[in-house]
């Protein structure tokens, strides 16, 4: 009985260690990020438009994998259009 419990605990510890290594490697892949506001709303075709808008910026990486998220920001003044804020992660 003691050996069975010891085996189960050691398997659990190894699982935790191995899963942490995978998270560190994933963070290394998309380690850099940038945030930029754009006019308009996010829309339905969000991901493709965000990535293309970000790649048009001179400071954005051109030939790298990029992941973007978009959120709408309401306008602060009446009559002014709202904007969308894109936060993108890319490989350094």
Curated annotation (Swiss-Prot):
Keyword presence, rRNA processing: no
Listed GO biological process terms: defense response to fungus; killing of cells of another organism; signal transduction
InterPro entries named in the record: SCRL (IPR010682)
Compartment(s) of residence: Secreted
Domain of life: Eukaryota
Position of the signal peptide: 1-26
Disulfide pairings: 32-92, 42-70, 68-88
GO cellular component: extracellular region
Keywords from the named record: Antimicrobial, Disulfide bond, Fungicide, Plant defense, Secreted, Signal
Disulfide bond recorded as keyword: yes
Assigned protein family: Belongs to the DEFL family.
Protein name (Swiss-Prot/TrEMBL): Putative defensin-like protein 225
Organism: Arabidopsis thaliana (Mouse-ear cress)
């Amino acid at each position: 009985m003691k050996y069975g419990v010891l085996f189960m605990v050691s398997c659990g510890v190894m699982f935790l260690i191995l899963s942490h290594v995978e998270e560190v490697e994933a963070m290394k892949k998309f380690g850099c990020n940038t945030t930029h506001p754009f006019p308009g709303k996010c829309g339905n075709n969000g991901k493709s438009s965000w990535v293309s808008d970000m790649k048009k910026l001179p400071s954005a990486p051109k030939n790298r994998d990029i992941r973007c998220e978009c959120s709408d920001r309401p306008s602060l003044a009446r009559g002014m259009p709202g904007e969308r804020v894109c936060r993108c992660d890319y490989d350094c």
